[in-house]
């Protein structure tokens, strides 16, 4: 039976994950086993539950208890459900709740690059992508378009930040991912060495004099390919491009020379994810 608790004190410590903890505090790098992430909307929460993540608590509009989010409650056991009217919850969190519900989950244990890539044929590698909306959109495309895993370098946005999770529509729980390198200094040199040791050829999505078209037949023939995507503004670092086996471009019309990284990822995954 749901453990429903009416909110009477905005300063109650059990509401900290929703109201006062920063993303870094939620992530808890010093004690990752105590880390938390927040999922938003019934569909996204349902996908987190499907993936086996343990719920810690929920924050829910009062009307959702018997409304569209009611099914979620039956799946969350005795996790406390903190509730109030929509306006009070918006005042508490600082934003309007998507579909009237948030859920705090325990973060999963970090996975290793070796574990994820052992049997993978196509992986995406994200370098320095800090916009959570783009990270979420890239994960959604990766799930839909045949990527076996996503690797992020240490300067990337956390894929489990609330907005990235929401934009991904919960697909961040469906595509395996791991951080490649422990510190920014490990990328690109050590990261590239690791990918090559695992049998991958690397393809930098970038414009250069040696760029090949994304439909180049040699790319399709590679048994294991890592597609490397760079930050929104400057793209990939020169050192990263130089370390990759291929530099790949997307042919474009009307004088357009680039796409947003999320759009470019969808095109790249569609073309290079064919197996």
Across the structure, where does each feature detected by a protein language model lie?
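Boundary-proximal intrinsically disordered activation/regulatory segments immediately upstream
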Residues: 1-68, 156-157
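A glycine-rich helix N-cap at a beta->alpha junction
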Residues: 75-94
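Short, aromatic/basic amphipathic alpha-helical patches
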Residues: 67-78, 240
């Amino acid at each position: 039976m749901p453990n429903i608790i009416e909110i009477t004190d905005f300063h109650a410590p059990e509401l900290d994950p929703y109201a006062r903890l920063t993303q870094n505090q939620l992530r808890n790098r010093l004690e990752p086993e105590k880390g938390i992430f927040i999922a938003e909307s019934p569909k996204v929460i349902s996908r987190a539950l499907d993936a086996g993540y343990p719920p810690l608590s929920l924050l829910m509009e009062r009307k959702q208890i018997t409304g569209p989010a009611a099914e979620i409650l039956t799946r969350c056991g005795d996790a406390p459900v903190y509730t109030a009217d929509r306006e009070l919850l918006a005042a508490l969190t600082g934003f309007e709740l998507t579909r009237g519900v948030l859920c705090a989950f325990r973060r999963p244990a970090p996975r290793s690059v070796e574990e994820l890539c052992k049997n993978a044929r196509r992986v995406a590698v994200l370098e320095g992508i800090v916009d959570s909306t783009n990270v979420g959109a890239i994960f959604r495309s990766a799930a839909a378009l045949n990527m076996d895993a996503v690797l992020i370098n240490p300067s990337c946005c956390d894929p489990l930040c609330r907005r990235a999770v929401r934009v991904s529509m919960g697909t961040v729980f469906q595509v395996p991912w791991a951080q490649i390198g422990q510190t920014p200094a490990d990328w690109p040199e050590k990261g590239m060495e690791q990918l090559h040791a695992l049998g991958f050829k690397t393809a930098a999505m970038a414009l250069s004099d040696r760029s090949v078209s994304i439909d180049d037949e040699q790319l399709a023939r590679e048994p294991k390919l890592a597609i490397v995507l760079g930050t929104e503004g400057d793209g990939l670092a020169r050192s990263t491009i130089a370390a990759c086996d291929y530099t790949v471009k997307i042919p474009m019309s009307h004088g357009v020379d680039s796409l947003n990284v999320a759009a470019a990822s969808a095109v790249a995954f569609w073309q290079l994810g064919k197996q």
